[in-house]
Design a protein with these regions (language model features):
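Glycine-rich NAD(P)-binding loop of Rossmann-like domains
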Residues: 111-142, 169
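Rossmann-like dinucleotide-binding domain for NAD(H)/NADP(H)
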Residues: 211, 217-306
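Short, conserved loop/helix-junction motifs that constitute active-site signature segments
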Residues: 51-59, 74-79, 205-211, 231-235, ...
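Rossmann-like adenosine-cofactor binding region
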Residues: 161-255
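Oxidoreductase and adenylate-handling cofactor-binding alpha/beta cores
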Residues: 95-111, 149-150, 280-289, 294
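Phosphate/diphosphate ligand-binding glycine-rich loop within oxidoreductases
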Residues: 38-113
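N-terminal glycine-/charge-rich "phosphate-binding" loop or analogous flexible N-terminal tail
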Residues: 1-45
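NAD(P)-binding Rossmann-fold cofactor-contacting core
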Residues: 149-166
Length: 306
């Protein structure tokens, strides 16, 4: 016996169609919201539509959100429903972006891209660097093998007090300040929660070596933007690569745009071209698990918010 699964809202046609096709391939009955036992959310940019749509689904048991970051839905995380998200789905694409940004910083590609005349050589070796990664989720799991050929000393800071395979060291957040003092490259790949908001601030930046770099592919809110601007201006760190910013989009008059030590990309760690291809089989598999009463992939802890 199958189950009824709806896809909503129909505001992003390409994503909506992909999700509908995935539901049908899974063996579930694609239905309207009113009859749905499962709901596949089809527009991560429209969380304000959720309450009205969910209210129509009297038999709703499970909600699948498309992205790993679910903070726009934080006010809707009712424990009466089972929640899953896209954590881990986009990790391969985002991990590639991290490596590209890290290499760009180490070779000063962002500086040379802005140059209008020939200049002297600037850059350093990524090989053997002390790399600190905040977050022990899917992005980090995919990133560690990419860093392995560079023989980096990798330190993962994660909430779970458990070694992460592939990392040289794994610590809980209490060790962060101690670790920052020997960090050559700091990578942010963690969930945004009340605990992690502003985790990189003036104090954190002051602990880092002057030659250190930061790569942020998580959420802009992890870094206090004004503190980063000051740290770059005063030479407290050597550079930053930001695929996410706070605010986002970053206003055109923000000083980070003109700072030669800052590389900004417009949240392209996971583009629609990459994301839909990765999300398609994931949705199909999770719906199949739902209708067969199997363990669901990427469950959300409602209490933790991720």
């Amino acid at each position: 016996m199958t189950k009824n699964v709806a896809v909503a809202p129909n505001t992003r046609p390409e994503m909506y169609k992909m999700m509908c096709d995935a539901v049908e391939r899974s063996g579930a009955a694609l239905t309207g919201v009113e009859d749905a036992e499962g709901l596949i959310w089809a527009d991560p940019a429209r969380p304000e539509l959720f309450p009205e749509i969910a209210e129509k689904a009297a038999s709703l048991q499970w909600i699948q959100l498309p992205y790993a970051g679910i903070e726009p839905f934080a006010n809707n995380l009712d424990p009466k429903w089972r929640w899953t998200c896209g954590k881990g789905v986009y990790a391969p694409a985002v991990a590639e972006t991290v490596l590209a940004l890290a290499l760009s910083l180490s070779k000063n590609l962002h500086g040379y891209a802005r140059a209008t005349e020939w200049s002297g050589p600037v850059g350093r070796y990524l090989h053997g660097s002390n790399v600190t990664i905040l977050g022990g989720g899917g992005i980090t799991v995919e990133l560690l093998p990419l860093l392995a050929p560079f023989d980096c000393v990798t330190t993962v800071i994660r909430k779970k007090d458990e070694n992460l395979p592939g990392a040289t060291f794994t610590y809980t957040p209490e060790k962060l300040e101690e670790v920052l003092g020997t960090t050559d490259l700091l990578i942010l790949a963690l969930a945004l929660t009340e605990e992690t908001k502003g985790i990189i601030d003036k104090k954190s930046l002051s602990l880092m070596p002057p030659h250190s770099h930061i790569v942020n592919v998580a959420r802009g809110g992890h870094i206090v933007t004004d503190d980063l601007i000051e740290a770059l201006k005063e030479g407290k760190i050597a550079g930053a690569a930001l695929d996410v910013t706070d605010p986002e989009p970053l206003p055109a008059d923000n000083p980070l745009w003109s700072d030669q030590r800052c590389l900004i990309t417009p949240h392209i760690g996971n583009t629609p071209e990459m994301g839909l291809k990765l999300l398609d089989p994931f949705i199909e598999e999770n719906v199949r698990r739902f209708i067969n009463d199997e363990e669901l992939l990427a469950p959300v802890d409602v209490e933790l918010g991720y």
